[in-house]
């Protein structure tokens, strides 16, 4: 592809705005600001130990998880980049206990931005792919946001995406009209369209789950994974491979490109806590992307994007990816009426 004919993210969004009339100018500008923030995060991630940002920060987030220095830095980059643009009423982050209203000295917009600033941060110090996940909602109360303003089901998302900071830095986006992938051209500093209308194969021979938790799984998950592991000699009559990176953005990006199912189920260790992944910051945006690419996403008992949130940091079980596999494991939950 010649440099002159490359489609940048800005050009792509402007063309979408003209062609579909469902991408308002303020939403387009918001997406561009988020993408610029992801470039800044990518730069800091790539510096590694040279940037003195590796290691823990000596603090915990609202989830009770030890924060990495890059967790805090990435959160600050996203807040600073988006607070003054006039497109947002408020923001919410996995790293903050409560939401962040746009300061009174800045103009306010009609959107809400929800994000996990650095997903997979346990991998930071060992140089494994990590990323940023985000979701955009309309503020139902106009420009005056409350915590309740954020508590909308995933079906209300107007945009969602993620960036992966790996061998290449990529930015994957949906605004409800398919899924497209942009790669960061570091020489010119632009996001360039490299994959259009991405589609997840309906069938797969790969699955992603943390198998070290197998003894804690509920029966539907145990049954499903046992069938996969039985290979050609089992009821599936085919061999399956397990892939687990412990970085949701990296695992989902692989599935988006070549198929597979990602599973993070609830388990018996914490029966009062339905899963580990956050509905607002991880499950909803990834489900929007996966469904737009022809896949499926459920909690095992219902479509993730139809879950009515009850809190900013609500957790849910997650099964997403190739449609036929997600439907199979979901049917096992229905048969067993289990988690």
From Swiss-Prot:
Cofactor: Mg(2+)
Cofactor note: Binds 2 magnesium ions per subunit.
One record GO biological process: sucrose biosynthetic process
Record's subcellular location: Cytoplasm
Gene Ontology cellular-component terms listed: cytosol
Record's signal peptide: none
Amino acids binding Mg(2+) 1: 94, 116, 118
Reaction equation(s) it catalyzes: beta-D-fructose 1,6-bisphosphate + H2O = beta-D-fructose 6-phosphate + phosphate
Keyword NADP appears in the UniProt entry: no
Keywords: Carbohydrate metabolism, Cytoplasm, Hydrolase, Magnesium, Metal-binding
Matching NCBIfam families: PRK09293.1-1, PRK09293.1-3, PRK09293.1-4
Name of the featured protein: Fructose-1,6-bisphosphatase class 1
Lineage of the organism: Bacteria, Pseudomonadati, Pseudomonadota, Betaproteobacteria, Burkholderiales
Name of encoding gene: fbp
């Amino acid at each position: 592809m010649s440099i002159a004919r490359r489609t940048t993210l800005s050009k792509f969004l402007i063309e979408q705005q003209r062609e579909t009339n469902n991408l308002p100018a303020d939403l387009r500008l918001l997406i561009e600001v988020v993408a610029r923030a992801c470039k800044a995060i990518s730069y800091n991630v790539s510096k590694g130990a040279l940037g003195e940002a590796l290691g823990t920060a000596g603090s915990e987030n609202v989830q009770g998880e030890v924060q990495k220095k890059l967790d805090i830095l990435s959160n600050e980059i996203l807040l600073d980049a988006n607070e003054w643009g006039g497109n947002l009423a408020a923001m919410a982050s996995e790293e903050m206990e409560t939401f962040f209203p746009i300061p009174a000295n800045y103009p306010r917009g009609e959107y809400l931005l929800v994000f996990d600033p650095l997903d997979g941060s346990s991998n930071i110090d060992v140089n494994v792919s990590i990323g940023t996940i985000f979701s955009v909602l309309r503020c139902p109360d106009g420009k005056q946001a409350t915590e309740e303003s954020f508590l909308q089901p995933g079906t209300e998302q107007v945009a969602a995406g993620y960036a992966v900071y790996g061998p290449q830095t990529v930015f994957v986006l949906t605004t409800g009209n398919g899924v497209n992938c942009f790669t960061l051209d570091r020489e010119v500093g632009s996001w360039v369209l490299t994959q259009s209308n991405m589609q997840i194969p309906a069938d797969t021979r790969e699955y992603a789950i943390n198998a070290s938790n197998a003894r804690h799984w509920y029966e539907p998950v145990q049954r499903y994974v046992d069938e996969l592991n039985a290979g050609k000699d089992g009821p599936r009559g085919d061999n399956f491979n397990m892939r687990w990176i412990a970085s949701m953005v990296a695992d989902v990006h692989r599935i988006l490109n070549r198929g597979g199912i990602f599973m993070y189920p609830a388990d018996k260790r914490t029966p009062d806590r339905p899963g580990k992944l956050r509905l607002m910051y991880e499950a909803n945006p990834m489900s929007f992307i996966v469904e737009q690419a022809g896949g499926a996403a459920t909690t095992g008992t219902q479509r993730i994007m139809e879950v009515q949130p009850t809190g900013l940091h609500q957790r849910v079980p997650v099964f997403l990816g190739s449609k036929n596999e997600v439907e199979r494991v979901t049917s096992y939950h229905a048969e067993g009426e289990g988690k």
